[in-house]
């Protein structure tokens, strides 16, 4: 009688199943053209979806739908596949002065502390989801490049008319990590209203004003 040994065969079968499971795992971010994870899961720096700090913490390289040390979700909603052009505000060249660039929100926010005005990059907002006019001023958005997964947080300081966002050129270039936006003249982005964190008590910063 021939005695069969199933050990090596069983081991190979288990290994094959394990590799197949990994290959079929959902990917996201720049590894998959800026795709977002389903069920609001976080996208890790390596392009995998999950909900633990390794996936969700910005300090761990989280690419999108991040939590942890990032801003908490704010009121205003979110939108996907929105057109984002760029505008040359260059706030760093004008002391982050809203009046100097004739921003719509300067009426209400021009006298805010320098630390507030310079905390985030600037954008004009006219997106399909969220408040408009004065109600949008000063609010923050987490903006994600759908092609690469690169993201940043911006503050609304102005209005626009393109049906999406008009990012400061510096912000635009920051998330245009593959240069396609520069070639096309626009990006396709997702945005989410987030908490700006302006209520954090930072007395040393709050009194600094370069005006």
From Swiss-Prot:
Coiled-coil ranges (or none): none
Domain Barwin: 77-198
Protein keywords: Chitin-binding, Disulfide bond, Signal
Record Gene3D superfamilies: Endochitinase-like, RlpA-like domain
GO MF term set: chitin binding; RNA nuclease activity
InterPro entries assigned: Barwin_CS, Barwin_dom, Chitin-bd_1, Chitin-binding_1_CS, Endochitinase-like_sf, PR4, RlpA-like_sf
Induction of the gene: By wounding.
SMART domains: ChtBD1 (SM00270)
Keyword tRNA-binding tagged: no
Signal peptide: 1-25
GO biological process: defense response to bacterium; defense response to fungus
Paired cysteines (S-S): 28-43, 37-49, 42-56, 62-66
Residue span(s) of domain Chitin-binding type-1: 26-68
A Pfam match: Chitin_bind_1
PANTHER family, A to Z: WOUND-INDUCED PROTEIN WIN2
Protein name: Wound-induced protein WIN2
Name of the gene encoding the protein in the UniProt record: WIN2
